[in-house]
């Protein structure tokens, strides 16, 4: 097995974790009430990722681009890594909520020349119906519901491509609030160097727990939480952004319950906690386990 210091791609990182600590919880998803909705270990995640990679290879998607349209949850991170193992370039973006959002997604599909959309089976028909109405929507786009089992046409596993560190791992898109969404290419090497720096600074390790409600298509959510947790071999507890927006205290309750050492958010999130959490509720919280709470992605207000 390759040594940790010799890892040069994100897929190698997951393989390492699955071999070294297969029974360690990798990710846990909480529902709106703060109860566990689902969880996955590194070993189970690796198995599911390989299945998705085979599905993508069987669809002929190697070396092609794919849009990832997922709600918050473990299904996203499994699909994301399925792309990496299959040599498919993933572009995670937000679920469309309006005609304006549909137009942005159409622009991203055009800009990336995407060949496929990865999504949940329950969302496929709705997305087909709404997105296909967009001008210049590609008629040959492949829809891949990654949570649905499909019998492979070939019983033999297709060989996984060899990925090198200089290859582009994924695309991150700007919000497109003031102009067309712009894609940023993130290489495996660039991402791993960033993760190494963050983990070294935070001193996170395989005993660490992260808590995040941040969108998985944003850098702070994807890299600083989902991938940093994987890099350190820790456990990442997830909440939906909508859960935090309606009940900010659930973020702090998760930190309290799981004795999390690491979390982060933009300044507005901390201010929302200050404004919305009542003194009586504060008595139920214990944030003494925190080693690092990142405040980033927007201007910091010292008064917060």
Regions found by a protein language model. Give the residues of each.
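AMP-dependent adenylate-forming
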Residues: 14-40, 168-171, 178
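Conserved AMP-binding/adenylate-forming core of the ANL superfamily
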Residues: 27-64, 68-77, 81, 98-106, ...
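Conserved pre-ATP/AMP-binding loop-to-beta segment of ANL
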Residues: 22-25, 153-173, 179-180, 190, ...
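Structural core segment of the AMP-binding/adenylate-forming
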Residues: 85-153, 267, 272
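Conserved adenylate-forming
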Residues: 131-145, 241-304
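Flexible, low-complexity linker/hinge segments
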Residues: 2-9, 103, 144-168
């Amino acid at each position: 097995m390759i040594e940790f210091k010799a890892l040069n791609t994100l897929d190698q990182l997951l393989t390492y974790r699955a071999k070294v600590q297969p029974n360690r919880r990798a990710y846990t998803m909480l529902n709106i009430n703060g109860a566990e909705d689902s969880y996955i270990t590194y070993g189970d995640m690796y198995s599911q990722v390989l299945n998705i990679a085979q599905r993508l290879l069987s669809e002929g998607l190697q070396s092609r681009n794919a849009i990832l349209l997922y709600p918050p949850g473990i299904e996203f991170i499994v699909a994301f890594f399925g792309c990496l193992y299959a040599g498919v370039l993933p572009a995670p973006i937000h679920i469309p909520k309006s005609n304006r959002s549909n137009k942005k997604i159409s622009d991203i599909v055009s800009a990336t020349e995407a060949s496929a959309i990865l999504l949940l089976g329950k969302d496929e028909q709705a997305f087909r119906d709404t997105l296909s109405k967009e001008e210049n929507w590609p008629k040959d786009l492949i829809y891949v519901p990654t949570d649905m089992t499909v019998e492979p046409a070939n019983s033999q596993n297709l060989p996984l491509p060899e990925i090198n560190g200089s290859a582009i791992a994924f695309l991150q898109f700007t919000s497109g609030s003031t102009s067309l969404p712009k894609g940023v290419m993130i290489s495996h090497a660039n991402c791993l160097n960033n993760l190494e720096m963050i983990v070294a600074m935070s001193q996170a390790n395989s005993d660490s727990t992260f808590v995040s409600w941040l969108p998985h298509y944003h850098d702070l959510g994807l890299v600083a939480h989902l991938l940093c947790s994987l890099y350190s071999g820790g456990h990442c507890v997830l909440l939906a952004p909508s859960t935090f927006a309606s009940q900010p205290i659930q973020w702090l309750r998760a930190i309290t319950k799981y004795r999390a050492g690491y979390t982060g958010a933009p300044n507005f999130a901390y201010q929302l906690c200050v404004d919305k959490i009542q003194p009586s509720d504060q008595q139920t919280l214990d944030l003494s386990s925190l080693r690092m709470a990142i405040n980033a992605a927007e201007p910091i207000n010292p008064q917060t």
